[in-house]
């Protein structure tokens, strides 16, 4: 289907990799790269909020774009990883379009530090997340009208989260009332 959409005016294939949407029955980055390269087109991977700084380039993405402020937890900035030719083309955009949004030296330094910390930090596994949340969830489940359980990341990443449900009738309050009360506590919970 992707190949059928390529025309003589096609300059590149853009692949958006996002954990915010479950990507089932989609081409992988490697499969999209094969299609792009079969048509002598570069594959641009928008991995703005993704965590792995090497996987998409290793999967044959020609240029991979990350947000410096999302998973990397740096300042408002971005990171471009890719083949030299394409990175050079990105660097040509130092004037003109987008100039007002270019990152200053402080942002570059902040991003550099964030990347260093990101690459050297110990990553918590899903099993470790479950272990850390276990007592909390058990305690929540002792409260009438509250049901708490572990849910795994729908996009397939090794991330465990707590899902907490409220039985409004048993508690006598709506979920929105409970949310508002949690925001008003000594430690605000959103």
Feature roles, as predicted:
Residues 1-123, 137-144, 149, 176:
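Conserved PLP-enzyme active-site core in the AAT-like
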Residues 126-128:
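Active-site capping/gating regions of soluble enzymes
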Residues 130, 134-138:
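Anionic-ligand binding region
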Residues 141-190:
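Conserved C-terminal alpha-helix-loop-beta "cap" of PLP-dependent enzymes
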């Amino acid at each position: 289907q992707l190949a059928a959409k390529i025309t003589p005016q096609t300059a590149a294939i853009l692949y958006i990799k996002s954990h915010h949407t479950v990507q089932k029955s989609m081409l992988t980055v490697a499969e999209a790269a094969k299609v792009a390269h079969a048509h002598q087109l570069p594959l641009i991977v928008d991995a703005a909020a993704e965590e792995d700084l090497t996987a998409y380039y290793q999967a044959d993405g020609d240029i991979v774009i990350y947000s410096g402020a999302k998973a990397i937890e740096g300042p408002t900035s971005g990171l471009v990883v890719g083949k030299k030719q394409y990175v050079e083309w990105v660097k040509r955009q130092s004037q003109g379009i987008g100039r007002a949004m270019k990152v200053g030296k402080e942002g570059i330094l902040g991003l550099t530090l964030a990347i260093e910390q990101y690459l050297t930090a110990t990553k918590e596994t899903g099993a470790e997340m479950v272990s850390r949340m276990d007592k909390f969830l058990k305690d929540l489940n002792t409260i009438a009208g509250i049901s708490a359980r572990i849910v795994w990341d729908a996009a397939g990443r090794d991330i465990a989260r707590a899902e907490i449900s409220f039985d409004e009738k048993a508690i006598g309050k709506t979920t929105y009332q409970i949310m508002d009360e949690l925001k008003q506590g000594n430690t605000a919970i959103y």
